[in-house]
């Protein structure tokens, strides 16, 4: 049998997932239970869209809970003190010059379980994150992206 996938995460990422899991188990489950009770009060379940919706919401939430529990159970937390100061790694904040847009951008390199590109948290498994990991200040990387090749120069590296 194969080993379960391990999720490299920062301490901050673990705390965020734990908070989301707690919310789903306490608040969201109660809300759904209440919706189901109300829907059952409407009688005939064969054409009760409120009941169907609540049951679908329940199934989605329970699936999300299992997913979060699995990620947390298989999390490998990056020790902040072991994050190198001069090499990009998970837990680093890296400032790069994006040559496509001629601008400076700061990314946090995180594990795939906590990636959020809209917040500039990119996974070490993403094309850009993977290209940056292991590099130093002054290095220039070229990354194959869906619309061609992007070029980045590493300007600064900090611990997350």
Curated annotation (Swiss-Prot):
GO biological process: DNA-templated transcription elongation; regulation of DNA-templated transcription elongation
GO MF annotation: an example: RNA polymerase binding
Coiled coil ranges: 49-75
InterPro entries membership: GreA/GreB_C_sf, TF_GreA/GreB_CS, Tscrpt_elong_fac_GreA, Tscrpt_elong_fac_GreA/B, Tscrpt_elong_fac_GreA/B_C, Tscrpt_elong_fac_GreA/B_fam, Tscrpt_elong_fac_GreA/B_N, Tscrpt_elong_fac_GreA/B_N_sf
Keywords: Coiled coil, DNA-binding, Transcription, Transcription regulation
Pfam family of the protein (one): GreA_GreB_N
Coiled coil keyword on record: yes
Protein family (similarity comment): Belongs to the GreA/GreB family.
Task of the protein: Necessary for efficient RNA polymerase transcription elongation past template-encoded arresting sites. The arresting sites in DNA have the property of trapping a certain fraction of elongating RNA polymerases that pass through, resulting in locked ternary complexes. Cleavage of the nascent transcript by cleavage factors such as GreA or GreB allows the resumption of elongation from the new 3'terminus. GreA releases sequences of 2 to 3 nucleotides.
NCBIfam families, sorted: greA, PRK00226.1-4
Listed name of the protein: Transcription elongation factor GreA
Organism whose genome encodes this protein: Clostridium botulinum (strain Eklund 17B / Type B)
């Amino acid at each position: 049998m194969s080993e379960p996938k391990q999720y490299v995460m920062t301490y901050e990422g673990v705390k965020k997932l734990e908070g989301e899991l707690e919310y789903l188990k306490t608040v969201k489950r109660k809300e759904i239970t209440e919706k189901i009770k109300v829907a059952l009060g409407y009688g005939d379940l064969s054409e009760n869209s409120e009941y169907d919706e609540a049951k679908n919401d329940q199934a989605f939430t329970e699936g999300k809970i299992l997913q979060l529990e699995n990620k947390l159970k298989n999390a490998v937390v990056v020790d902040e003190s072991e994050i190198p100061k001069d090499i990009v790694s998970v837990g680093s904040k890296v400032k790069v010059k994006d040559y496509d847009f001629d601008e400076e951008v700061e990314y946090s390199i995180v594990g795939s379980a906590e990636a959020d590109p809209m917040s500039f948290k990119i996974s070490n498994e993403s094309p850009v994150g993977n290209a940056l990991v292991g590099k130093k200040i002054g290095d220039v990387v070229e990354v194959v992206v869906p619309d061609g090749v992007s070029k980045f120069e590493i300007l600064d590296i900090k611990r997350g």
